[in-house]
C-alpha cells in the first residue's frame, strides 16, 4: 500500500461491486448513529464523511447541516453523489488530504479499518487537525486482534478497544462514548463492531 492510498485490492472491490454494496448498505442503515452524532455537535456548519462509501450518511447529513465533504478513494462511490446539493465530493484517501480546523464533525463509518494500523493512526491525526476546537469524531470499526483479507479480497485491520482508545487519547481526543455490538458482515458472517464518539480537546 502506498503512503497516500487505501489498499488497492479493497478499492477495486468497491469500484467493481458498488451497486451491490449500495443496495446492501441501504438495507442496513437506520440513521440512529447519525442522529446521535448530530445531537452531540456544538454547531452544524460542516461535516466530513471519511470513506463515505455508498453515501447514505453524506446524503442524510446534507439535509441537516450547511455543508458535507464526502471523501472516498472509490470514484464509483463519489460519482453517485457528486451532483447532490450541499455535498462536496473528493475522490481520494484520507491519507492524501490536509485540512486545518474547518469541520465541526468528522464521520468515519467502517472505513479506516481498511488501512494498516500505522495508517489508521495517521488518518486519525489528519482528522484531528481537520476539526475545529471541540469538534466531534465518530469512528465505526470492527473489533478484533488480527488483520485479514475476507473472501472478497478486502483488507480488514480490526482493533482492540483498549489499544484504540489509548491511541485516540494520545492524538488528543477525549473519549465520550464507546459501545460494542454484535452484527453481520457484508458476507453475512458474525462480527463485533465498535462505535466510538470522541471530542477534540
Predicted regions and their residues:
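Conserved acidic residues
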Residues: 104
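A conserved beta-strand element that flanks and buttresses the S-adenosyl-L-methionine
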Residues: 107
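Helix-to-beta-strand junctions that scaffold the AdoMet/dcAdoMet cofactor pocket
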Residues: 115-116, 131-133
Amino acid at each position: 500500500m502506498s503512503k497516500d492510498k487505501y489498499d488497492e485490492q479493497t478499492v477495486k472491490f468497491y469500484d467493481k461491486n458498488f451497486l451491490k454494496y449500495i443496495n446492501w448498505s441501504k438495507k442496513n442503515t437506520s440513521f440512529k448513529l447519525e442522529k446521535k452524532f448530530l445531537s452531540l455537535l456544538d454547531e452544524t456548519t460542516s461535516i466530513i464523511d471519511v470513506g463515505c462509501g455508498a453515501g447514505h450518511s453524506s446524503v442524510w447529513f446534507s439535509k441537516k447541516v450547511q455543508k458535507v465533504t464526502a471523501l472516498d478513494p472509490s470514484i464509483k462511490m463519489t460519482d453517485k453523489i457528486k451532483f447532490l446539493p450541499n455535498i462536496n465530493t473528493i475522490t481520494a484517501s484520507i491519507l492524501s488530504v490536509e485540512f486545518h480546523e474547518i469541520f465541526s464533525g468528522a464521520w468515519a463509518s467502517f472505513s479506516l479499518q481498511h488501512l494498516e494500523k500505522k495508517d489508521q493512526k495517521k488518518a486519525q491525526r489528519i482528522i484531528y487537525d481537520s476539526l475545529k476546537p471541540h469538534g466531534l469524531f465518530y469512528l465505526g470499526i470492527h473489533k478484533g486482534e488480527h488483520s485479514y483479507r475476507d473472501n472478497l479480497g478486502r483488507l480488514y485491520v480490526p482493533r482492540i478497544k483498549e489499544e484504540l482508545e489509548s491511541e485516540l487519547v494520545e492524538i488528543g481526543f477525549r473519549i465520550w462514548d464507546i459501545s460494542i455490538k454484535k452484527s453481520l458482515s457484508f458476507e453475512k458472517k458474525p462480527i463485533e463492531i465498535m462505535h466510538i464518539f470522541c471530542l477534540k480537546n
